[in-house]
């Protein structure tokens, strides 16, 4: 029974965190489930928001070709999300053409501020490559707005009993979104 319980717990951790953490971080959580704290906690995080600049021009380029617009946005989000995961970030959510990510939760990351900045720089570098690729396809260049803030915020599972997300909130999050 203990084996089944542990297996189910590991599967739950993979289901909950597998889509927005690197496989190595998910494995750490599976081996050490006590690192997860249900509810919320105050913690210093580095929070990043990015958004596409020039989205109106890009969407006008596609006109009524919603599949084309969806495909190019998915390519962009995939490339940028990879940088978050590679640098030990937690992808919080997509908000239209924006992304929200944070560092130092659910696992401790003593280098969270540096990792967030490294991610931003890597994203900007990859954006250049991405724009070179899509230029060959006749697609207008993507611009990127990027804000990073480090502050003590509340992080944890938040929402309703029917649906919740692992996210963060507080003044520090709001500031990052406005940078």
Task: Label each region the model flagged.
Residues 83-115, 129-173:
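Catalytic core of nucleotidyl cyclases, primarily class III adenylyl/guanylyl cyclases
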Residues 11, 15, 19, 23-24, ...:
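Feature representing long, continuous alpha-helical segments
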């Amino acid at each position: 029974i203990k084996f089944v319980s542990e297996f189910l717990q590991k599967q739950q951790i993979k289901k909950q965190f597998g889509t927005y953490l690197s496989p190595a971080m998910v494995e750490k959580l599976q081996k050490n489930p006590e690192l997860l704290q249900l509810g919320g906690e105050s913690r210093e995080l580095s929070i990043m928001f990015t958004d596409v600049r020039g989205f109106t021009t890009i969407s006008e380029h596609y006109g009524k070709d919603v599949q084309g617009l969806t495909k190019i946005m998915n390519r962009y989000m995939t490339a940028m999300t990879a940088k978050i995961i590679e640098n030990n970030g937690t992808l919080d959510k997509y908000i239209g053409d924006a992304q929200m990510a944070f560092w130092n939760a659910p696992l401790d990351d003593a280098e969270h501020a540096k990792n967030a900045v490294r991610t931003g720089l890597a994203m900007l570098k990859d954006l250049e490559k991405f724009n070179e690729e899509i230029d060959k396809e006749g697609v207008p260049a993507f611009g990127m707005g990027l804000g990073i803030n480090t502050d003590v915020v509340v992080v944890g599972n938040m929402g309703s009993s029917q649906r919740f997300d692992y996210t963060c909130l507080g003044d520090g999050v709001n500031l990052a979104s406005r940078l």
